[in-house]
Amino acid sequence: MRQYEVMYILKPDLEDEESTQLIEKFSKIITDRDGEITELNRWGKRRLAYEIKDYREGHYVVMKCRAEHAAAQELDRVFRITDGLLRHMIIRED
């Protein structure tokens, strides 16, 4: 298993319940594939460095996990088709 750091920015106009559901959905992708979430930090609403999709703010979430490469690929695929997401990044830590 590899160590990953995942950062994603949710749209600021999502309700708390909707953002919580998305975070649980993304975490479940890792845990369903025998991965482990080691850390999950919700940074809250912050101003973006530049405008993304007509938004100037977003809810930042940082997740550290241990997972197989296939789980990271699936997470990336789901990120790309999720409407409530502004931006995402998956980094493999060495």
UniProtKB/Swiss-Prot annotation:
CDD domains according to UniProt: bS6
Gene Ontology biological-process annotations: translation
PROSITE patterns per UniProt: RIBOSOMAL_S6
Residue spans crossing the bilayer: none
Keywords attached to this entry: Ribonucleoprotein, Ribosomal protein, RNA-binding, rRNA-binding
GO cellular component terms given for this protein: cytoplasm; ribonucleoprotein complex; ribosome
SUPFAM superfamilies: Ribosomal protein S6 (SSF54995)
A GO molecular function held by the record: small ribosomal subunit rRNA binding
Pfam families: Ribosomal_S6
InterPro entries recorded: Ribosomal_bS6, Ribosomal_bS6_CS, Ribosomal_bS6_sf, Ribosomal_S6_plastid/chlpt, Transl_elong_EF1B/ribsomal_bS6
Family listed: Belongs to the bacterial ribosomal protein bS6 family.
Function: Binds together with bS18 to 16S ribosomal RNA.
Protein name: Small ribosomal subunit protein bS6
Organism: Desulforudis audaxviator (strain MP104C)
